[in-house]
């Protein structure tokens, strides 16, 4: 702490990202990265943009990412004016907190959810309330039907992996006409129903996506928001008051190319889903209680061992999973669905540790 810090900095509890180990060959199952490389078309697009000399890099990128937004809009069947592109979905969410979620009534989100939400709320001084999940970690839809303020939640939820059906999401959006409802769909491609199809009917709906998970571009830092043009304009006003050039040239062309390679996207997405079901079965056989998942991770509780201890023991073997020291979930582990080989290494290590 420094005497030069502002009051808001003194009060912050910053988000703690998953560990990025500096090891040659870790089994890295702690940050929900895709185990497969991005589309070859994305790599080709980067090479073309660079050329032989890298001449393009001396120029600023398109500040509105026009071609990328047009491609993504066409992919989802919406207008480019309904698409906002930002430097990762976390930045997109940050802009939403500033542009759309700061009102007299408190923002509402689940008590067990993405831990950046309370961090942003404190940073931007957005009053908020947490709404308890049910005992099985599902969102209680009836708790959000009173039009009592803005609503934010991931679908599928993180870190639990549970998903709400689209009909329930529509009930929440329809019940809150005077407030913005933000659905964070970082993991939607692994088994949930997207709410993008509802945008045309609900001007209060904002849907956030990322290319970090299903499109294997976490290193590019690209995220999107989809919604009514007025909501997108609000995000753009905040962006242009903060950073007019959030997406670099390489990120724009790589992401555009990835959306143009549907075959690669579908093949890798389906492989992750198949590996998830395989991992769920293996963990259940070891005596874990596994929460039903529609994401690229599983949330599992060891019945006979302490979760934090298991995570530490796995780390000693260079196998990384995520443990959250938080109420209600401190006996669970969030485990990314890696390649089958990575998942096999995890299961083998767990089998030894549980038998010790």
UniProtKB/Swiss-Prot annotation:
Subunit note: Homodimer.
Class in the EC hierarchy, top level: transferase
Keyword Transferase belongs to the record: yes
GO function term, MF aspect, one: histidinol-phosphate transaminase activity
Lineage, top ranks: Bacteria, Pseudomonadati, Pseudomonadota, Betaproteobacteria, Burkholderiales
Cofactor: pyridoxal 5'-phosphate
Pathway membership: Amino-acid biosynthesis; L-histidine biosynthesis; L-histidine from 5-phospho-alpha-D-ribose 1-diphosphate: step 7/9
UniProt protein name: Histidinol-phosphate aminotransferase 2
Name of a matching Pfam family: Aminotran_1_2
Family: Belongs to the class-II pyridoxal-phosphate-dependent aminotransferase family. Histidinol-phosphate aminotransferase subfamily.
Keywords: Amino-acid biosynthesis, Aminotransferase, Histidine biosynthesis, Pyridoxal phosphate, Transferase
HAMAP family linked: HisC_aminotrans_2
Record carries keyword Transferase: yes
Positions where N6-(pyridoxal phosphate)lysine occurs in the chain: 213
Source organism: Burkholderia mallei (strain ATCC 23344)
Gene Ontology BP terms: L-histidine biosynthetic process
Gene: hisC2
EC assignment: 2.6.1.9
Reactions catalysed according to its record: L-histidinol phosphate + 2-oxoglutarate = 3-(imidazol-4-yl)-2-oxopropyl phosphate + L-glutamate
């Amino acid at each position: 702490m420094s005497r030069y810090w502002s009051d808001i900095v003194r009060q912050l509890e910053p988000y703690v990202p998953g560990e990025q180990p500096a090891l040659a060959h870790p089994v890295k199952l702690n940050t929900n990265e895709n185990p497969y490389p991005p589309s070859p078309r994305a790599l080709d697009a980067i090479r073309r943009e660079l050329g032989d000399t890298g001449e393009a890099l001396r120029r600023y990128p398109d500040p509105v990412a026009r071609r990328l937004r047009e491609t993504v809009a066409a992919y989802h069947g919406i207008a480019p004016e309904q698409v906002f592109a930002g430097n990762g979905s976390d930045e997109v969410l940050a802009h939403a907190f500033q542009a759309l979620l700061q009102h007299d009534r408190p923002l509402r989100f689940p008590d067990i959810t993405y831990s950046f939400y309370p961090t942003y709320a404190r940073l931007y001084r957005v009053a908020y309330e947490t709404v308890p999940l049910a005992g099985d970690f599902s969102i209680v839809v009836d708790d959000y039907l009173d039009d009592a303020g803005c609503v934010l939640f991931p679908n599928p939820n993180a870190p639990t992996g549970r998903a709400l059906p689209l009909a329930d999401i529509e009930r929440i959006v329809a019940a809150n006409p005077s407030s913005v409802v933000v659905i964070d769909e970082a993991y939607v491609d692994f088994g949930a129903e997207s709410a993008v199809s509802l945008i045309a009917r609900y001007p209060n709906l904002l849907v956030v996506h990322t290319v970090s998970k299903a499109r294997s571009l976490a290193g590019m830092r690209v995220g999107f928001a989809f919604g009514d043009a007025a909501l997108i304009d609000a995000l753009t006003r905040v962006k242009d008051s903060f950073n007019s050039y959030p997406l670099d040239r390489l990120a724009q062309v790589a992401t555009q190319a990835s959306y143009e390679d549907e075959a690669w996207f579908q093949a890798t997405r389906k492989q992750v889903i198949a590996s998830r079901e395989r991992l769920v079965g293996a963990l259940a056989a070891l005596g874990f209680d596994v929460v039903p998942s529609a994401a690229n991770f599983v949330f599992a509780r060891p019945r006979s061992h302490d979760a934090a201890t298991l995570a530490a023991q796995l780390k000693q073997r260079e196998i990384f999973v995520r443990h959250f020291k938080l109420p209600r979930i401190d006996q669970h582990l969030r485990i990314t669905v890696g390649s089958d080989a990575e998942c096999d290494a995890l299961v083998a290590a767990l089998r030894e540790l549980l038998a010790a």
